[in-house]
Amino acid sequence: MTRLFLDVETYSPGLKPTYDDRIIAIAYKQEDGSVTVLKEWESDEKQILTRFLEEIKRIDRLSIIGHNILRFDLPLIINRASAHGIASTGDLMRLLLDPYPIDTIQAQLPANNFFFKGLGLAECAKRIGAETRTCPGSEIKTRYDEGDYTAITEHVREDVLTTEKLFNYLAQVG
């Protein structure tokens, strides 16, 4: 089984991200590899989605792991890729959902009385001693508008690494 850790950042003009927001960065990492960050500002959204999906197709026995990927990242990728005509919604769902994605936020729900509150990645990371020092996700739009792409790259990269640490912690404590 090849584990692939995933995080996506969007340009969200509103207070809360939506499935229609533009994807500005996709970061992923195979378990024994380094983090790859695909950046919209170096190409465009359609190109980074196409490259990511092509990479996924090449992986045998894939398991995609992320924090809140079942409620946000994967539906967002499916919606945006479909909107760009990269593939049909059905093909995208088979590609991304058939490998049984693992969502670290969902894995913690029973221990949190089935409430999502308090299960943000930064909060979970702090509890396991894996705190990050990058800009908060709420600043991504501002950083993008300012052209501070380094901060966004560091943020999405750290989110992937933190998700991997959280997954390994959850797997260890059972």
Predicted regions and their residues:
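Conserved RNase H-like, two-metal-ion catalytic cores of nucleic-acid enzymes
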Residues: 1-56
